[in-house]
Design a protein with these regions (language model features):
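Compact beta-sheet-dominated domain cores in extracellular/mature segments
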Residues: 2-108
Length: 108
């Protein structure tokens, strides 16, 4: 009887764990860039699949010199909210110069 109850509790716990929604998958590592004033800035362990408007940047004053030290591909956009036709895809480990301007990023 005791084994039956223990087995039932274990199966119930497993089903509950599978039913609870998980948080967004986080990318491991740092995404670094420079603001329009040249200050170093970055995002640590960003969530995947969610657009991030980069602090210290805007469409009128975008950041530059992105470095993708995360484990995921980063797509950087010139405009906020990951919108617009101007974007660039950065594989993990990619470093780009000050000619690439950005205001938002999404990781995949």
């Amino acid at each position: 009887m005791r084994l039956h109850q223990t087995l039932g509790a274990a199966v119930g716990a497993l089903l509950l764990a599978l039913a609870v929604p998980t948080s967004a998958h986080a990318t491991t590592g740092d995404f670094l860039y420079k603001t329009s004033t040249g200050q170093e800035a970055g995002v640590a362990d960003p969530a995947s699949g969610r657009c991030i408007d980069l602090p210290g940047t805007s469409g009128d004053a975008p950041g530059h010199s992105p470095r993708n030290f995360t484990t995921s591909t980063a797509t950087v956009f010139l405009e906020a909210d990951c919108e617009g036709d101007t974007y660039y895809v950065m594989k993990p480990g990619t470093k780009l110069g000050d000619k690439l301007k950005l205001s938002s990023v999404v990781f995949s």
